[in-house]
């Protein structure tokens, strides 16, 4: 890394790039060393992050966001992206107007009338819901809402909302949505019928300790968590 890299990445001047490099060297001298042959600063042998913690998931999430087209390469904080790709998944189309209307209803604490296509009915149906949150089950986006027809809190798949129209003040209290507000802890482990080697591999895959991993999940997401499979 040299001044030119900082100037390109952050759009700063030559003087500012020099100042930033010198400041970093002063606060973390063991993290960086100047390589005369490369005319650049390189990672020190005893490097230890000063401003960020070791978190592989953040790095990999950036790669996934770029692969999915959510994040432009120029906007990623990874300086040099490695060669990468991701297996495509079917697009779950959420209409921007629908999303905007639902989010507005959440912010304004309103009920909103939606035209919703459920799996249990052959034709879409207009209904009033009082959305208070948005959730993702790993594949689909939902809005968590009080259904004024069924008189219960439930999930509505965003891509199945075909239209919206009127709004009105909501009368339900999100605080009474027990399944959304309460969490449970799932304890998972390798299937006992797997071989010892296979169990060790599964434990590595999921970061298990002593053959177990604990996952905190909202009760509302319990069904999705239990039915998820890699």
Language model: regions and residue ranges:
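Conserved aromatic-histidine-acidic binding/catalytic patches
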Residues: 8-9, 90, 213
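A generic structural signal for beta-strand entry/edge sites
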Residues: 38-40, 140, 212
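Polybasic (Lys/Arg-rich)
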Residues: 181-230
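Bulky hydrophobic/aromatic content
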Residues: 43-117, 228
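Core beta-strand-centered patch of the WYL/Sm-like small regulatory domain
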Residues: 81-193, 197
């Amino acid at each position: 890394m040299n001044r030119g890299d900082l100037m390109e990445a952050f759009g700063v001047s030559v003087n500012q790039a020099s100042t930033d490099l010198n400041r970093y060297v002063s606060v973390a001298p063991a993290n960086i060393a100047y390589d005369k042959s490369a005319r650049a600063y390189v990672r020190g042998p005893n490097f230890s992050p000063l401003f960020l913690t070791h978190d592989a998931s953040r790095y990999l999430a950036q790669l996934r966001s770029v692969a999915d087209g959510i994040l432009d390469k120029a906007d990623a904080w990874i300086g040099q992206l490695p060669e990468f790709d991701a297996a495509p998944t079917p697009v779950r189309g959420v209409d921007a107007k629908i999303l905007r209307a639902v989010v507005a209803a959440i912010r304004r604490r309103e009920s909103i009338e939606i035209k919703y296509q459920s799996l249990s009915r052959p034709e879409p149906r207009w209904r009033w819901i009082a959305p208070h949150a948005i959730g993702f089950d790993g594949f689909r986006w939902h809005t968590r809402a009080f259904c004024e027809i069924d008189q219960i809190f439930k999930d509505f798949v965003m891509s199945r909302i075909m239209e919206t129209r009127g709004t009105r003040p909501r009368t339900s209290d999100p605080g009474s949505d027990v399944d959304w507000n309460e969490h449970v802890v799932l304890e998972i482990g390798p299937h006992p019928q797997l071989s010892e080697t296979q169990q060790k591999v599964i434990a590595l895959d999921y970061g298990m300790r002593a053959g177990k991993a604990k996952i905190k999940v909202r009760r509302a997401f319990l069904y999705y968590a239990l039915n998820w499979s890699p």
